[in-house]
Regions:
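Bacterial N-terminal signal peptides
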Residues: 4-15
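Flexible, solvent-exposed loop/hinge segments and secondary-structure transition points
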Residues: 19-154, 158, 162, 166-182
Length: 182
């Protein structure tokens, strides 16, 4: 085998398995990713005041979710006059960097769908798969979403799986505090 070929094989072996990082949904696409039947969406931005931060944090007690954003974006999704729910954009830290999620919540607070908007880690991007994210469908605010127990883990993506679970709980807590869910 030639030296060039050996160097190429070594370089490929040392390279990351694939591009995990990226922006996958724009803010405009996000509500339609979790509510594909929506024919109208309206956007609201909520500045994170100390009172709002404390109220959301109180609902998250025991979940290890972080409340560090300066604002939260929430979309009201409708089909005709029917309220489908709210799409809540939240971020949670993966291993080193934030992962941006959009969590679709039905009016009763149960998860309609979850999507990854932006993934900034070199590994663990498999959590973007529909197979993984479908585990959150129909989970309510009182339902546990613990990796290895309630949610199947993704090999090599444990911290990203934990971030997804925290993001779902954070979105549910925020929606409840804002009075968007029952």
């Amino acid at each position: 085998m030639s030296l060039a070929r050996i160097l190429l094989v070594l370089a490929l072996a040392a390279a990351p398995a694939g591009a995990q990082e990226g922006q996958f949904l724009s803010e405009a696409e996000a509500p339609h990713a979790v509510f594909p039947d929506a024919d109208s969406v309206s956007r609201s931005a909520f500045e994170v005041t100390p009172a709002l931060r404390d109220a959301v944090s109180a609902r998250l007690e025991g979940t290890r979710a972080s409340v560090w954003e300066s604002q939260w974006i929430v979309f009201r999704a409708q089909h005709g006059t029917e309220l489908l729910g709210h799409a809540v954009v939240v971020e949670e830290i993966g291993k080193h960097r934030p992962i941006t999620f959009v969590v679709g919540l039905r009016p009763d607070g149960r998860v309609a769908d979850v999507a990854v908007m932006a993934y900034r880690e070199p590994y663990g991007g498999e959590i973007r798969s529909a197979r993984f994210l479908s585990q959150y469908h129909d989970k309510g605010p009182a339902d546990a979403v613990r990796p290895y127990r309630d949610i199947r883990n993704v090999a090599g993506a444990t911290l990203s799986v934990e971030a997804a679970s925290r993001a779902v709980k954070k979105a549910q807590a925020l929606a409840a505090v804002l009075g968007l869910t029952s």
